[in-house]
């Protein structure tokens, strides 16, 4: 009787092994699909390309006009503000790219020593960047700006900076999120269409950089 039970258990384990392999293979395929950047986006992802563009448009169309009115009342020049906004986006993207490069370097070492396949290393690397992106999404925007760009706006009075701070914090935060997207995104400053309104300083379009 005991021998029969052992034999049945052994046969059950043998029969289960292919199922376990199939389950692992399915999980790996699903994980791989999650990391594909292509045109597929998760509707629940708060930092998807679509959501990032929506946040940029909302800032440009709703937040910026209020700040612009305050700055105009203080006789601030639009060109100076435009330069500040561009520098904020540029600096934030640079800081985000540094962090991404550090992740690249760390996973480059892991690829040599871990024995994982290049595809698996790429997936883990992308997941780490996505986790960083989500962490920044939930970060206090003004604190992020202070830590990453402490010298911002030194040429302005405290009153003007008080008006600008919510906007520059939003720009810095959003630029970090855009830079960590796959592919990276940024406002299309190179093709900024001249406007009759000198205060129309934000590009209409978002451009994609090369894939990570």
What are these regions (language model features)?
Residues 1-212:
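Extended, amphipathic alpha-helical stalk segments that mediate dimerization
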């Amino acid at each position: 009787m005991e021998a029969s039970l052992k034999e049945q258990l052994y046969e059950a384990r043998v029969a289960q092994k292919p199922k376990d392999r199939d389950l692992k293979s399915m999980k790996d395929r699903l994980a791989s699909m999650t990391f594909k950047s292509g045109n597929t986006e998760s509707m629940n992802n708060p930092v998807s390309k679509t959501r990032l563009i929506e946040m940029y448009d909302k800032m440009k169309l709703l937040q910026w006009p209020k700040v612009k009115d305050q700055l105009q009342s203080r006789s601030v020049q639009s060109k100076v503000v435009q330069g500040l906004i561009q520098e904020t986006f540029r600096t934030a993207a640079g800081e985000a790219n540094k962090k991404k490069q550090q992740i690249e370097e760390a996973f480059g070492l892991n690829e040599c020593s871990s024995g994982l396949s290049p595809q698996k290393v790429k997936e883990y690397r992308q997941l780490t960047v996505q986790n960083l992106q989500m962490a920044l999404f939930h970060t206090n925007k003004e604190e992020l700006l202070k830590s990453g760009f402490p010298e911002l706006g030194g040429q302005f009075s405290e009153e003007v900076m008080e008006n600008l701070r919510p906007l520059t914090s939003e720009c810095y935060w959003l630029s970090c999120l855009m830079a960590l997207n796959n592919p990276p995104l940024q406002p299309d400053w190179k093709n900024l269409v001249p406007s009759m309104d000198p205060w129309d300083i934000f590009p209409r379009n978002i451009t994609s950089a090369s894939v990570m």
